[in-house]
């Protein structure tokens, strides 16, 4: 591998301009200021190469190795475009099965295929792999969702790999571990020995080794209220009970059993042979994972929750920012990708009373496709491999490879948040304006958590505002200590700082963080602070006002046929979903002012809705839905805007909703859109209104 550059035949990028295309943002609506600090460059991909990144690693000579979901491995020389010359792509291996991880070791490449951990070598130095060795293989059932990820190397030289659960046939919503070690993390040695490590994963797409410790990223789904990052130790149970099917095996280190979970949380399993009933959210509060963990030793709760729809919808890779300052002031912190929303979040950790905890804040969004894998270049830049086939993404492209470069300018950001015995300490990258920092009305802290249940995802529960009673700004202006009442252990705390400014009067680049408070530290409580009292908060708008706040004769969501429609609707439509974030009908044609009955059915595996909006407003409505924040799910991700003409409820997988509305009186092309977070870019259709 050391002389790989000289030995591979090169594939010239014919017809592509020198260098890279600069991408200031995915679209004009994204915060332009992000690009002032971390610019994005799009690597050109030769025609005919489908570069759906499943694995990505930097080689010792600075080249990249990229493994694709289609089973190819490419070597990309000169990825940073030095001397204004093009990158070169060379196929190193092919014929593998859906690679979703890649590592370099001693001149070879090691990757997770669907059913095995494989090591490939170029023994004759001709630039192509000629030896494919099985390091360790595991059984598969053939279900499409049995993805395998990794490896990542532990300090002792062994590797971690993880595997998805499958789903049922008739009960297609229910995660299943059909064969051994699905839904587990496994430790594998280079000589092919496997040790089951931890159970309870659902879709563990990201593996991170941080200071020698193993962390993994999880996706929202059944039993998973939202995405998160968890510190994993041998014997941990991580939350999804399907993999506990194998916990009785003698080689299993996991002590939790399915009965421990099912006796405390009803799994609502359909009987063999049916009827098959998909579990839906119940009005009762239920239990949170941490509450079950108090009763069942061995359950590991997340170190950092990533609120669904806010910091992503499909958590992917984990990487650690190098401490050499080539990538700005955040050295040692994590970056966590999100495939569905085409973004990266930044995570800062601390350890309190033996437990990892910390916060997350948005870092960079606007990638061209779904963020799947990340690797660091020798110059300190970040390469981001992307894909969205079958999964969908906010980014519009099927695949992409981009480079994120620190421009040298320091953004005004939350550097980190630390838990205190009586509140939080927030550290910033620049000194704050003291007047704005001491204004209690410029802060807003809300604690909340998710349900632990067999339903896909969870609404926010137990959300309560936390009163700020005191503020103290450090002498250098870079730290603000908050005295906070109402903090709760194991809860997520949304910390919003919309009023904070730096010395130049600039607002934070990203003003909201989400801190998971697993333990309150001991220590000295705050003294010498400025006592404060917040102004009364405005009462939240009622959901009814949200649904009916317009001047139409019909409510924006009318679910029964209006009594004046004695002859019934003029036109009836059934609209469905297709994989990849699409409606099954791209256009509906209606007459101006006609009476419409529309039923939307959701056959997808994630929630969707239908909003009919005014011309040209689909993207702004989609962004407004994301900005609903913690209230988004409660409001069905339907913002209270005049541009929203009619809408369904938020429809869970397998569900349907019927609405009645009057078609616009003015002919033209209107848009219908799904505003569930991350969907609005691609999930759109046209309502063509004719005279």
Which residues does each predicted region cover?
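Acidic, Ser/Thr/Gly/Pro-rich low-complexity segments and short DxT(G/T)-type signature motifs
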Residues: 408-413, 433, 497-557
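Beta-strand cores of secreted/periplasmic/IMS beta-sandwich domains, seen most often
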Residues: 57-58, 63-64, 72, 586-612, ...
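Extracytoplasmic beta-sandwich strand-turn segments characteristic of Greek-key/jelly-roll folds
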Residues: 458-475, 618-667
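A short glycine/threonine-centered beta-strand motif
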Residues: 423-436, 484-486, 497, 600
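Beta-propeller domains with acidic blade repeats across secreted/periplasmic ectodomains
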Residues: 26-411
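N-terminal edge beta-strand
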Residues: 408-409, 566-595
């Amino acid at each position: 591998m050391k002389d790989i550059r000289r030995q591979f035949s090169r594939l010239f990028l014919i017809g592509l301009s020198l260098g890279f295309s600069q991408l200031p943002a995915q679209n004009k609506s994204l915060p332009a200021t992000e690009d002032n600090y971390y610019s994005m460059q799009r690597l050109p991909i030769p025609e005919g190469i489908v570069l759906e990144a499943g694995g990505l690693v930097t080689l010792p000579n600075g080249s990249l190795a990229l493994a694709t979901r289609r089973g190819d491995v490419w070597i990309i020389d000169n990825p940073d475009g030095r001397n204004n010359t093009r990158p070169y792509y060379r196929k190193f291996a092919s014929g593998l099965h859906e690679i979703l991880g890649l590592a370099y070791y001693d001149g070879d490449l090691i990757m997770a295929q669907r059913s095995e951990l494989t090591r490939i070598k170029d023994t004759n130095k001709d630039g192509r792999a000629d030896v494919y060795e099985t390091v360790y293989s595991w059984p598969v059932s053939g279900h499409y969702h049995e993805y395998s990820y990794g490896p990542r190397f532990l300090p002792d030289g062994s590797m971690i790999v993880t595997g998805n659960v499958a789903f049922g046939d008739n009960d297609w919503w229910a995660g299943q571990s059909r064969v051994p070690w699905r839904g587990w993390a496994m430790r594998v040695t280079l000589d092919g020995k496997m040790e089951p490590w931890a159970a309870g994963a659902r879709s563990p797409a990201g593996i991170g080794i941080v200071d020698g410790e193993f962390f993994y990223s999880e996706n929202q789904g059944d039993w998973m209220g939202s995405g998160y990052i968890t510190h994993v130790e041998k014997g941990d149970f991580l939350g999804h009970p399907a993999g506990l099917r194998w916990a009785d095996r003698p080689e299993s280190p996991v002590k939790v059993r399915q009965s421990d979970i099912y006796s405390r949380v009803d799994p609502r399993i359909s009987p063999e042979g049916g009827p098959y009933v998909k579990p839906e959210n119940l009005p009762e509060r239920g239990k949170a994972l941490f509450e079950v963990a108090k009763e069942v030793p061995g359950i590991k709760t997340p170190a950092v929750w990533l609120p669904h729809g806010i910091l992503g919808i499909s958590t992917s890779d984990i990487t650690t920012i190098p401490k050499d300052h080539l990538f700005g002031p955040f050295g040692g912190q994590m970056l966590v990708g999100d495939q569905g929303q085409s973004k990266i979040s930044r995570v800062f950790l601390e350890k309190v009373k033996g437990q990892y905890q910390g916060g997350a804040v948005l870092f960079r969004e606007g990638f061209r496709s779904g963020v799947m894998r990340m690797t660091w270049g020798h110059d300190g830049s970040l390469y981001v491999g992307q894909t969205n086939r079958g999964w969908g993404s906010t980014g519009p492209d099927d695949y992409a490879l981009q480079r994120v470069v620190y421009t040298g300018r320091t953004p005004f950001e939350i550097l980190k948040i630390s838990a205190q015995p009586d509140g939080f300490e927030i550290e910033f990258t620049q000194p704050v304006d003291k007047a704005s920092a001491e204004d209690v009305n410029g802060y807003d802290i809300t604690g909340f958590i998710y349900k632990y249940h067999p339903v896909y995802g969870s609404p926010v529960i137990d959300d309560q505002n936390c009163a700020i009673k005191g503020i103290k700004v450090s002498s250098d202006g870079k730290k603000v200590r908050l005295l906070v009442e109402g903090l709760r252990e194991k809860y997520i705390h949304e910390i919003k700082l919309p009023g904070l400014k730096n010395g130049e009067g600039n607002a934070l680049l990203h003003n909201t963080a989400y801190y998971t408070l697993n333990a309150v530290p001991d220590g000295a409580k705050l003294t010498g602070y400025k006592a404060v009292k917040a102004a009364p908060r405005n009462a939240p708008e009622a959901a009814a006002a949200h649904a009916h706040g317009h001047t139409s004769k019909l409510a924006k969501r009318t679910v029964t046929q209006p009594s004046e429609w004695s002859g019934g609707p003029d036109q009836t439509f059934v609209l469905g979903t297709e994989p990849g974030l699409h409606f099954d009908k791209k256009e509906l044609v209606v007459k101006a002012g006609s009476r419409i009955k529309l039923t939307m059915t959701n056959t997808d595996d994630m929630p969707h809705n239908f909003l009919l909006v005014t011309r040209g407003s689909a993207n702004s409505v989609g962004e407004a839905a994301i900005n609903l924040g913690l209230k988004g799910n409660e409001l069905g991700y339907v913002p209270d805007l005049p541009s929203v003409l009619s809408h369904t409820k938020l429809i869970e997988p397998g569900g349907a909703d019927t609405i009645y509305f009057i078609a616009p009186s003015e002919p033209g092309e209107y848009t219908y859109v799904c505003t569930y977070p991350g969907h609005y870019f691609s999930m759109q259709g046209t309502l063509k209104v004719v005279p």
